[in-house]
């Protein structure tokens, strides 16, 4: 009879299906390296309303302009929504890209497009931004290269599972955020893991020679040792432990998942993680406002305002804003005309994004939409152009050639060019 140690004792699985030892095994042969810049992608899942946030049309008819009014920012000529006063006072720190357009008004496909910079294909699985960074700039094995706050939606695609994100649970204000939140089973503390590691060692001796080991068996060999080192490492545990923050600093970001997630992303960048995706699925922060658009945005926009402002301030205070590329966007915009339920529906023909950090020139608006925010008023920009710009700001050439898992050469981005005015 063959005994499977994985059936007897498991280290908690990551959202990608990788245990921490497996994650380390796949990165073992890689050499520590550093990108030109770290990156944070704030994915506003659901498709936020561009005309109620960063692209208001106060002169449009009431059924289009809606309830919100624009307010002036600290940069002359730039206005944003009245429910984002903190970002209004920091407009010099970021750039707004308006007139982004595509033709994929579907959540699933739209997310794939915006999370990879490549229009979805039936034949190719494209990697998300963080996986590309992980491929190009693997980090020290004692710290993950790429962390996804909440489960990754796209994954590493043709690059392979060794470039998957290390998935972290969404943090909650006032709840200690320890390593068990990112890698261990619910309720398994580091102290308990120590005793279970001892059991692992005993089992390894007892069952040695009774089974053929393959690359998917977790909790064995030197990678288990590395996994334990990471779990028990003060440096790594500290990066994920929001309870170490001063309460006032935590409050600055907001007492909600969005604010605490951006606080966690800042801590990870400070610790040396190369890329963080902050993905918030529809729940507390649902931008898919088919109904009650304005009442929901009265909650959503102030929270986003506070969290992003906190992130920009913290990175600048710690001299990291110039070395961190930041992008915030959803999968599409919303319809110009308000529907009968007081909401706005999917609209991919116009949307916007916010870019900051690195070489991005803050205090500007690039691109524009027409009088009803329905279309770009000129040629517009594609998600591919956003991706090329984001990669350039990180330090990765968008025409870099990779190999698919079957050995076929493929260019990182099929289309798109960096938006020159951003830099």
Predicted segments — roles?
Residues 1-423:
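Ligand-binding pockets and gating/stacking loops
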């Amino acid at each position: 009879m063959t005994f499977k140690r994985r059936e007897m004792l498991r280290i908690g699985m990551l959202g990608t299906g990788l245990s921490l030892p497996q994650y380390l095994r796949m990165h073992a042969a890689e050499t520590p390296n550093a990108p030109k810049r770290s990156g944070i992608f704030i994915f506003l899942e659901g498709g936020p309303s561009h005309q109620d946030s960063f692209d208001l049309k106060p002169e449009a008819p009431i059924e289009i302009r809606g309830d919100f009014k624009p307010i002036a920012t600290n940069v002359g000529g730039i206005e944003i929504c009245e429910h984002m006063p903190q970002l209004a006072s920091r407009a010099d720190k970021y750039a707004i890209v308006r007139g982004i357009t595509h033709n994929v008004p579907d959540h699933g496909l739209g997310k794939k497009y915006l999370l990879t910079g490549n229009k979805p294909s039936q034949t190719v699985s494209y990697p998300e931004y963080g996986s590309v960074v992980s491929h190009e700039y693997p980090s020290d094995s004692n710290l993950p290269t790429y962390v996804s706050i909440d489960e990754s939606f796209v994954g590493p695609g043709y690059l392979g599972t060794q470039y998957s994100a290390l998935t972290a649970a969404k943090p909650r204000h006032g709840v200690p955020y320890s390593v068990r939140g990112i890698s261990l089973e619910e309720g398994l503390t580091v102290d308990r893991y120590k005793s279970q590691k001892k059991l692992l060692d005993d089992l390894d001796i007892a069952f040695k020679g009774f089974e053929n080991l393959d690359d998917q068996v977790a909790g064995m060999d030197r990678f288990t040792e590395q996994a334990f080192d990471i779990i028990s490492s003060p440096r790594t545990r500290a990066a994920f432990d929001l309870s170490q923050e001063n309460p006032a600093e935590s409050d600055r970001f907001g007492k909600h998942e969005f604010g605490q997630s951006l606080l966690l992303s800042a801590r990870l960048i400070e610790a040396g993680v190369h890329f963080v995706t902050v993905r918030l699925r529809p729940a507390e922060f649902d931008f898919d406002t088919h109904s009650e658009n304005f009442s929901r945005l009265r909650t959503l926009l102030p929270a986003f305002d506070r969290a992003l402002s906190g992130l920009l301030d913290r990175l600048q205070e710690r001299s990291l804003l110039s070395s961190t590329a930041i992008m915030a966007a959803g999968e599409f915009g919303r319809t110009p005309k308000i529907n009968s339920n007081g909401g706005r529906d999917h609209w991919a023909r116009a949307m916007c994004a916010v870019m900051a950090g690195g070489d991005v020139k803050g205090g500007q608006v690039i691109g524009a939409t027409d009088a009803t925010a329905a279309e770009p008023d000129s040629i517009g920009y594609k998600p591919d152009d956003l991706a090329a710009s984001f990669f350039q700001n990180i330090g990765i050439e968008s025409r870099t050639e990779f190999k698919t898992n079957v050995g076929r050469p493929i260019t990182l981005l099929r289309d798109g060019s960096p938006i020159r005015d951003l830099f």
